[in-house]
Amino acid sequence: MLEVMIAAPASGSGKTSVTCGLLQALKDRGLAPAAFKCGPDYIDPMFHRSVLQVPSRNLDVFLAGEERVRELYRRHTAGCGAAVCEGVMGFYDGMTFGGDRASAWDVARLLELPVLLVLHPYGSSLTLAAQVKGMLSFRKDSRIRGL
């Protein structure tokens, strides 16, 4: 099964647009994708649902715990050809200032998902390369596999 998390350095970077476009492309190819959103957000899953015509599930490590998130992911990907999980906020931004618990990275680590990083290059050029380099090396296994 094809699996990917769509994440970004910050909110407002285009994660939801990329996620919905990817879900539609996978659906058009007959892969029956499952859609997920990190955290308790209910707005972005409504956009996912409008593309797929099936529910998008929330994966919230803070509220549900790691084992429940694993179980929900396994249950709702059974029989699917692909799974797309949209990250939350900035990739490493967790529930507390300076912490990464319940961040998109935390969920990607937990579920062993490869990460596609969405970048919003407005007003920058070489600085974007420095930002990506920092994100790749910030954690031993960033799980970032593409931009």
Predicted features by range, described:
Residues 2-13, 17, 23-111, 119-143:
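ATP-dependent carboxylate-amine ligase catalytic core
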